Amino acid sequence: MKKIAFLFLVFWFVSCSTNSDNIESPQNKINNVEIIFTTTAPKTDEIQITYYDIAAGDNVSSARQFIYDNNGSPLPLKLVFNDCKYRFLDGEAFRNNFSDAALKVQILVNGELLVERTSKGSNSRFATLNISFRILK
């Protein structure tokens, strides 16, 4: 009987918590999300980016071309979502041609790298990157 009473007290003590311990709850946290795409394709490259815009309630799809510097090196392509209040981002990016050049995405939330993925295409497959992830934990 003493063991049962002791276990009951332990469970009761552990289950009690206050909201004052969690000052910045995930529901109230605002995140700055940065999605950075890079390519190893020489001279020219274009990717198709699609994602669901929760605020607009619609899918967004656009082709984006990489810009190259004077040395022919590709510059990173960035998507920035400041003050993002949503829990997730759902989308993908793909190269709309057959190339074996690598396509890479890095997803940063408040400056912290959360996701890094790389994809290489072939002469029969597009390089495709899934950019779906949870922003809040």
Q: How would you describe each model-predicted region?
A:
Residues 28-40, 84-93:
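Noncatalytic modules at the cell exterior or secretory-pathway interfaces
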Residues 13-35:
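Bacterial Sec-dependent N-terminal signal peptides
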Residues 33-70, 77, 129-131, 137:
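Extracellular, modular beta-sheet/disulfide-rich ectodomains of secreted and cell-surface proteins
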Residues 48-50, 104-108:
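Beta-strand signatures of extracellular beta-sandwich domains
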Residues 1-18:
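Sec-dependent bacterial lipoprotein signal peptides
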Residues 115-137:
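C-terminal partner/receptor-binding element of secreted or periplasmic proteins
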Residues 53-103:
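Mature extracytoplasmic domains of secretory-pathway proteins
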